[in-house]
Amino acid sequence: MRRQAAAEQSGDRSPHSKKVASYKTAFLQGLRMTTNRSKCASTVFIAVILSGAAVPHVSRVGAQTSQTASITIDASKVENRISPLLYGQFLEFMYQGIKGGLNAELIRNRSFEEAPNIAGLSRYWERYPDDRNDDYALAFHWDDASAYPPQRPKVDTGERAMKEHSPRVDARDGAIQRHGLYQARIPIRAGLEYRGYLWLRADDYKGAITVALESDVKQGEVYASADINVIAGDWRKYEFTLRPEHSDPLAQFVILFPGRGRLWLDQVSLLPGEAMPGGVRRDVFEKIKALKPAFIRWPGGNVAQDYRWLWGVGPRDERFTWVNLSWKNELEPSDFGTDEFILFSRAVGAEPSITVNVEGRGATVEEAAAWVEYCNGPRTSKYGAMRAANGHPMPFGVKFWEVGNEIWGDWVRGHSDADTYARNYNRYARAMRAVDPSIKLIAVGDNNMNWNRTVLRAAGENIDYLAIHHYYGRREMAGDPLNLMARPLFLERFYAQVEQLLREIVPGERIKLAINEWGLDLPDERQYSLESALYGARLMNVFERSGNLVEMSAVSDLVNGWPGGIIQANRQGLFVSPIYLVNQLYSEHRGDKRLAASISSPTFDTSREGSDVPYLDAVASRTADGRKIFIKAVNTSPTSALTTTITVQGVIAGSQAEIETVTAPSLTASNDFARPDAVFIKNKAARSGRSFVVTLPKHSVSVITLAVR
């Protein structure tokens, strides 16, 4: 992920008159769609987007007072295929994306690696019942001399190794009976089973310990508790189960030390019994599964150039806590590693796409090849045996591998010029394919054509996909929100230029584009707004029109993250953004082939992105069985609905259409934790046939489904 919006390609701005002409030509050419006739019943899907920020001028269909439009589809003509991989997702170790959003683990800083407070307790942990306890009778010490596990395999990052810590607990005479430590803000539900464990090393401690879920406002009110008999000696794992009798979004998890003596505590865990494969929260899991992602990209993003995969395999409690150099130097637990990611991806129906570290933070080509062997090698191989020992004897069969992330950017470790990256790419490609020749490799591309040209010339024969990322924000909009609504059409022309470059350097149509990060950098109140969804929907229409080239795409980010995860999750709940809703609509209505279509629409002008930009953007596609047509339509007008005549040629359409729409009274409308359903998908039925009329609300995204034969 880039820290700023993507730079324009070199020499991209032409004189205004040429720009206007190119908009008209590119847009009209891009919207002609067709499909083959089918004798069986079939359905057509139409998606329409109306932008919400412009005042129309005299358009090709009449004066600005006339807000009518038309879509004419020729189902006998196919313009291009649409990749089944087109709608994927992107997941990164970023802020609370995984450790506080995706992961079901309820205990924060469970390995006690964060710096301690004045009481000697690591971050998120506090004395119980409060700081008035007798410090002498119950003392805590953040100890780096003893921690679990006692030893870990070394992974050389070229940095000073981070010491492992655990709290040493000294319980002496004079302490009150119910004393210990706790962690606050633990959301619990009545009747749900919570499975936990902790590791203890007992020196001369005598007695039991107690774990409990309690009220944070009614001190001492216990929802559930369990006693653990402590056995003297070296590190030992103690498991427990808690089933609270009451629900509480802000409960406390308490560990009490009623005995006397010294012990060490480490690796505390508490997971709800409903956790999904990979240790993922059930509510987040269900929202992701509803998106029907074709693939999920991980671990980054920028952080891919920080991450060392060996940190995240093996027994959960023996993994590293590492410093995330990309995102505020936060400490990251390794609970969600390779095994968990793959299990989670497959459980939601997605193919895993893994980004390997290229020369960042001490990473090597041998390490990348070893990662491929861990995932895809036989159990008789060195790293396949490691995978089998971790509980997965059969190879995972990971198909998609990305070789580095945004190497051209000085914000990532291992960044370089294009020549150096191309040489490194070839080394990595040879080593990784020597392990598994069947894998598909994704190379780092850019919005700068000079980078792409250099990489393709030197490494094109080894590339399956070229990854390009798009971010657009406040700086690029230059105070004109209409620029946002027009920007996807600039990218449509850019893809045509990339395609021309590919055909010049690499004969045939073998290399495809992966737009596996796209997003916006707007103020929060607009980042999650309907306005953002209009931009996203128009861009996804561009992806479908560019289907001969663009095969993979993913919005940034999936959960929390930066600049605007489409699922926003905190410990008490979640909401989805309007961009999530249009992602869901587009993914659910995936046609196999794009049909020829012509569109007539009012237009608007912008300060940076050209003139005569149509308010209406639409694509039509047909399912593989020929029984449905989907029309995806975006109305970007901020003020006017579009009365739209839809004509379908080359098939016989059914008498009723299904229309699903994302809109709201205001362009700035958004969801939040207090109002998670302020913006939602609205469904209605409408009369249809060979020619019919629909009203596309102002600033809206609609998907129209037609049964055809």
What are these regions (language model features)?
Residues 326, 330-334, 340, 427-430, ...:
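Glycoside hydrolase catalytic-domain groove-lining segments
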Residues 93-94, 480, 511-617, 627:
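Aromatic/acidic polysaccharide-binding cleft in carbohydrate-active enzymes
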Residues 363, 367-372, 446-471, 518-532, ...:
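Substrate-binding cleft/loops of secretory-pathway carbohydrate-active enzymes
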Residues 357, 387-388, 429-450, 495-521, ...:
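Aromatic-lined carbohydrate-recognition surfaces of secreted/lumenal glycan-active proteins
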Residues 266, 394-413, 452-491, 511, ...:
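Aromatic- and acid-rich polysaccharide-binding/catalytic face
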Residues 64-334, 351-355, 363, 369, ...:
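Extracellular and organelle-lumenal recognition/adhesion modules and their flexible linkers in secreted
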Residues 1-2, 11, 15, 40:
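Glycine-biased, low-complexity coil/linker segments
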Residues 227, 612-653, 659, 702-705:
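Carbohydrate-binding surface patches
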